A protein has these predicted regions:
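Membrane-interface helix-loop junctions and terminal tails of multi-pass membrane proteins
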Residues: 1-227
């Protein structure tokens, strides 16, 4: 595997996490409190759209350990390459979180806990896992439909469609779980902050959702080429 592939995964994950964390910190009272949930959703969605279009032809534009695991489950990436992808994604997310921690005031970082996706106070463990499964399932279906399935590729909206899915997932699920859908997005700020509460749930839910969606699309929806 060429180094540029892993660099693309690093940079694409950096795009997503820097924009997302930055938007959350910008919405704090310490910075100005503007934007709110809609701005946060748009920041994540637009950044991912650009990153997918920029790097999709290089690495496939996973930028998410759950997506990589779904591709592994359907034989679209080898186990060794999947591990390398995930390490690159975690490094990109951590670099983005560190950059945001250095740029924004410490009061904003503390107020938003560096943008770590966390559940509402009333949400149970089952709610967190269930919502993250649903949100990531929808994201992975969008990825397969626009970037994997040749019938979707012909429409040429892959990055835009995937980014919009992340945006509406955040609008729908953000108030419940923080709408991570991406273990790297959770890992980066958690590592910088040393805050691991609920962290495991943000691996389990997205990975289950992504693998389920990948298997459903691969075995039920995707047209198989005749042998």
């Amino acid at each position: 595997m060429k180094p540029g592939v892993l660099l693309a995964e690093f940079l694409g994950t950096f795009f997503l996490c820097f924009a997302g964390i930055g938007a959350i910190l910008s919405a704090t009272s310490a910075v100005g409190g503007g934007g709110g949930l809609v701005a946060i959703a748009l920041a994540h969605g637009l950044a991912l759209s650009v990153a997918v279009n920029a790097f999709g032809g290089v690495s496939g534009a996973h930028f998410n350990p759950a997506v990589t695991t779904g591709m592994l489950a359907t034989g679209r990436i080898s186990a060794s390459n999947a591990v390398a992808y995930i390490v690159s994604q975690l490094l990109g997310a951590t670099a983005a979180a560190q950059a945001c921690a250095m740029i924004f005031p410490a009061t904003a970082v503390a107020e938003a806990n560096l943008g770590i996706p966390l559940p509402a106070g009333w949400a149970s463990a089952g709610t967190v896992i269930g919502v993250e499964i649903i949100l990531t399932f929808l994201l992975m279906i969008a990825i397969f439909g626009t970037a994997v399935d040749p019938r979707g590729q012909a429409v040429k909206i892959g990055g835009f469609g995937i980014g919009l899915t992340v945006a509406f997932d955040i609008l729908a699920g953000g108030p419940v779980t923080g709408a991570s859908m991406n273990p790297a997005r959770s890992f980066g700020p958690a590592l910088i902050q040393g805050h691991w509460d609920w962290h495991g749930f943000y691996w389990v839910g997205p990975i289950i959702g992504a693998v389920l969606a990948a298997l459903v699309y691969h075995h039920v929806i995707l047209e198989k080429k005749p042998a």
